[in-house]
């Protein structure tokens, strides 16, 4: 019997955690994932996308994220009917399923050639902005959001000769993380795992005159509170903080999923962030400005954003 005031030990739970985090477990899971990747590749791009979307919609019927998404959509779009919001939600699950299988075909999916624009599956709005960032000799920041297939952005930038140092969340499985790193870095710029040292690596890249990219639409517990769809959220202030420190251009970028397996990539002109009385970028107001841009994107294509995330806490 456990003594009063002391927690019971959970040896089975600890043992399970140790086993699942072991090298053997990581290797076994990676073996299964690699087999699944091979199976997806054998389906071909179009069929795999349809299957991925259908599977995601089916799974979505049974998970708690669907209830959260319905709650988020009702708060964000009270003017829409329940049927309209449900249609958006089905689009969210379809898009997520498609995005997951598109990882397998990312090298073929981004078939853009800067010398022959308009011939592949990727339309680009803001070619002049890509070229200006590439040639201006300045560091730069690109912010984006989890819209459509967000991985396409960095690949397109690299095709225009603009490699971007990108922040990403590494999988907990070390073997899978290494696979993804190798695959991604062959197609885009350097990847920096989002951890405690990430800010220093990103800052070092800007010191070298490079360009950095980051997704800024998810919850950040230590960030300032800013409005998002009429409600306060804790937002990631890193874009505004870096822009304040380096006084470099800030651009927004997004991917839009189009019919028939096509995409449109858009890079905005420099976004003017508010400044304080000393002429420096105001971090809180700058973060609010970034989130207002993201909100505009989401309102335009709500079915292409991840409403499954607990954004309002």
Language-model features: where?
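Catalytic core of membrane glycerolipid acyltransferases/transacylases, capturing the structured
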Residues: 109, 134-195, 221-226, 232
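Residues that cap or flank secondary-structure elements
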Residues: 61, 121-122, 145, 172, ...
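Non-catalytic C-terminal accessory region of glycerolipid acyltransferases
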Residues: 2-9, 20, 24, 43, ...
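Short Gly/charged-rich anion-binding patches and loops
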Residues: 35, 68, 128, 152, ...
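Membrane-anchoring hydrophobic helices of lipid-metabolizing enzymes
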Residues: 2-144, 181, 188
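Generic structural signal for isolated residues within well-ordered alpha-helices
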Residues: 38, 72, 156, 179-182, ...
């Amino acid at each position: 019997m456990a003594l009063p005031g002391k927690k019971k030990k959970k040896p089975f739970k600890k043992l399970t955690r140790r086993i699942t985090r072991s090298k053997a477990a990581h290797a076994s899971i990676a073996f299964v994932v690699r087999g699944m990747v091979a199976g997806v590749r054998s389906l071909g791009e179009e069929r795999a996308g349809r299957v991925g979307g259908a599977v995601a919609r089916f799974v979505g019927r049974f998970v708690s994220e669907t209830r959260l998404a319905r709650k988020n959509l009702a708060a964000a779009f009270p003017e829409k009917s329940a049927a309209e919001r449900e249609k958006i939600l089905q689009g969210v699950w379809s898009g997520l399923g498609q995005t997951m299988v598109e990882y397998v075909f990312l090298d073929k999916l981004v078939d853009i050639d800067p010398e022959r624009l308009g011939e592949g599956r990727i339309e680009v709005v803001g070619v002049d902005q890509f070229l200006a960032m590439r040639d201006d000799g300045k560091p730069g920041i690109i912010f984006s959001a989890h819209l459509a297939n967000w991985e396409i952005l960095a690949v397109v930038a690299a095709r225009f000769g603009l490699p971007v140092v990108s922040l990403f969340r590494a999988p907990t499985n070390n073997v899978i993380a290494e696979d993804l790193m190798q695959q991604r870095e062959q197609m885009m710029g350097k990847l920096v795992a989002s951890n405690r040292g990430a800010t220093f690596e990103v800052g070092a890249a800007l010191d070298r005159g490079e360009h950095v990219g980051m997704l800024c639409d998810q919850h950040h517990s230590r960030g300032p509170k800013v409005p998002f769809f009429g409600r306060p959220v804790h937002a990631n202030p890193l874009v505004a903080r870096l822009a304040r420190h380096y006084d470099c251009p800030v651009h927004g970028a997004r991917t839009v999923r189009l019919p028939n397996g096509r995409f449109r990539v858009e890079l905005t002109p420099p976004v003017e962030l508010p400044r304080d009385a000393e002429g420096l970028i105001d971090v809180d107001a700058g973060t609010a400005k970034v989130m207002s841009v993201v909100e505009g994107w989401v309102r335009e294509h709500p079915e292409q954003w991840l409403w499954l995330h607990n954004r309002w806490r």
